[in-house]
UniProtKB/Swiss-Prot annotation:
It comes from Sinorhizobium medicae (strain WSM419) (Ensifer medicae). Its main location: cytoplasm. HAMAP family: UDG. One of its GO terms (biological process) is base-excision repair, AP site formation via deaminated base removal. It catalyses: Hydrolyzes single-stranded DNA or mismatched double-stranded DNA and polynucleotides, releasing free uracil. One of its GO terms (cellular component) is cytoplasm. This is Uracil-DNA glycosylase. Keywords: Cytoplasm, DNA damage, DNA repair, Hydrolase. It is found in: Cytoplasm.
């Protein structure tokens, strides 16, 4: 494993072989080329692995899987569906809050900063970890999907039962890497305004997740968000990939 990779230690141990694979070398080269050509990449380099940093492998209790980062200015910070404090809550997250209200009676937060979930063991993972500014899905097919497949496999191999919330057909592809005899897989349409009314609303995934965790002797997730979120802690230097 390249010692210059900046990654939380439990994930670094589990994912070390991935960084020695040729596809990661190609991905690194692609990202460097993008920046050299003046293209802005979101999130910032130090936040590519933010979801892994905040939720160590042995603490994962729930996985929520997104597609790729927000591509608007100031939005993406390495956690799927989450935005920085002070940034307007995106429509998909508004719908997630609506489902939380219907499911658990939790009033919608006045912000879209989900870091408190991550610190409780909710892995907020995008399938693709970078995007070009203003171009949705622009970094798909460059290697991130293979890397996040490895992330899901690593979670699946943990002894502790985990809940996988897979919203939309893109996220549901990752179910192939999950042992349903040990873990709970919950599927629903994506919370986007285009599909939320097709089955995301009413899915009750949040209460189902907590019921499963409790049944396994694990603490449930407190899905309430702090009224005033702390500022995200920035990593000082970007990872070498």
């Amino acid at each position: 494993m390249d010692s210059t990779i900046r990654l939380e230690e439990s994930w670094k141990a589990a994912l070390g072989p991935e960084f020695r694979n040729g596809y990661m070398t190609e991905l690194k080269r692609f990202l460097l080329d993008e920046k050299q050509q003046g293209r802005q990449v979101f999130p910032r380099g130090g936040e590519y692995f933010r979801a892994l940093d905040l939720t160590p492998l042995d603490r994962v209790r729930v996985v929520i899987l997104g597609q790729d980062p927000y591509h608007g200015d100031g939005q993406a910070h390495g956690l799927c569906f989450s935005v920085r404090p002070g940034v307007r809550t995106p429509p998909s997250l508004v719908n997630i809050y609506k489902e939380l209200k219907e499911d658990l009676g939790i009033d919608p937060a006045r912000h879209g900063f989900l870091e408190s979930w991550a610190r409780q063991g909710v892995l907020l993972l995008n399938s693709v970890l970078t995007v070009e500014r203003g171009r949705a899905a622009s970094h798909q097919g460059r290697g991130w999907e293979r890397f996040t497949d490895a992330v899901i496999r690593a979670v699946n191999e943990q002894a502790q039962p985990v809940v996988f919330m897979l919203w939309g057909s893109y996220a549901q592809r990752k179910a192939a890497f999950v042992d349903r005899s040990r873990h709970l897989v919950l599927t629903a349409p994506h919370p986007s305004p285009l599909s939320a009314h097709s089955g995301f609303f009413g899915c009750r995934h949040f209460s189902k997740a907590n019921a499963f965790l409790t049944s396994k002797g694990l603490d449930p997730i407190d899905w309430r968000l702090p009224e005033d979120p702390p500022l995200a802690v920035e990593r000082p230097t970007p990872p070498n990939c």
